[in-house]
Swiss-Prot record:
GO cellular component, one term: cytosol
Domain of life: Bacteria
Cited InterPro entries: YgfB-like, YgfB-like_sf
This protein's name: UPF0149 protein VSAL_I2539
Family per record: Belongs to the UPF0149 family.
SUPFAM superfamilies (UniProt xref): YgfB-like
HAMAP family per UniProt: UPF0149
Length: 189
């Protein structure tokens, strides 16, 4: 069986734009990770109706967007259910600059939280660790970069925040998400 790879940010961005969808790669991936971490069934069709409703007024996506969305979904499932429990984030890379990366992270986190809501997260049964992780993510979603501050310090702080987002998301996924998938270890990082 072939290895599953995450499509490149620019490839996803182009496919979404060419399809006329007003969703960024970070938003798409954040929604998918949120839905998966919230307990969405792991088959390749479960995400589609929710995504269509959220991003396209309930209308289906063009085939090219479905293909790219499915590739992102399959990679994400493989990562989150694999033995290494990893999380790659589909946000702009280092070459895109700190402001773009920070905006992408904010989009990703906001849509992760929305993805949890789409699968009807029940907070009354959530552990304290999950509640704390969600509060942290809500605060992180509102953070911004101050262009007047030392850019190197801002870069360092961004990396710390990015790592904390990983911890929060994995904490939530471990509590609510589906367990090991038999082909999950095929993801390439």
């Amino acid at each position: 069986m072939s290895e599953i790879k995450m499509p490149e940010f620019l490839t996803v961005e182009s496919a979404l734009k060419d399809s006329g969808l007003a969703v960024t790669p970070a938003e798409l991936h954040g929604l998918l990770v949120g839905m998966i971490s919230g307990g969405l069934p792991l088959d390749d069709n479960a995400w589609k109706p929710l995504m269509y409703d959220y991003t396209n007024d309930g209308l289906g996506w063009p085939d090219s967007a479905i293909q790219i969305g499915s590739a992102v979904f399959q990679f994400t499932v493989a990562e989150l259910t694999g033995s290494e429990l990893a999380l790659s984030m589909l946000i702009p890379n280092d070459k895109e600059g700190l402001m773009n990366r920070a905006d992408g992270l904010s989009e990703w986190v906001n849509h992760f939280i929305s993805g949890l809501g789409l699968v009807d997260l029940k907070m009354d049964k959530a552990s304290e660790a999950l509640k704390e992780a969600l509060v942290d993510l809500e605060e992180i979603a509102r953070l911004g970069i101050d262009e007047d501050d030392d850019i190197e310090e801002q870069e360092s702080l961004f990396e710390q925040v990015l790592e904390h987002v990983h911890v929060c998301v994995l904490t939530i996924h471990l509590e609510l998400g589906q367990r090991i998938h038999k082909d999950a270890s095929k993801a390439v990082h």
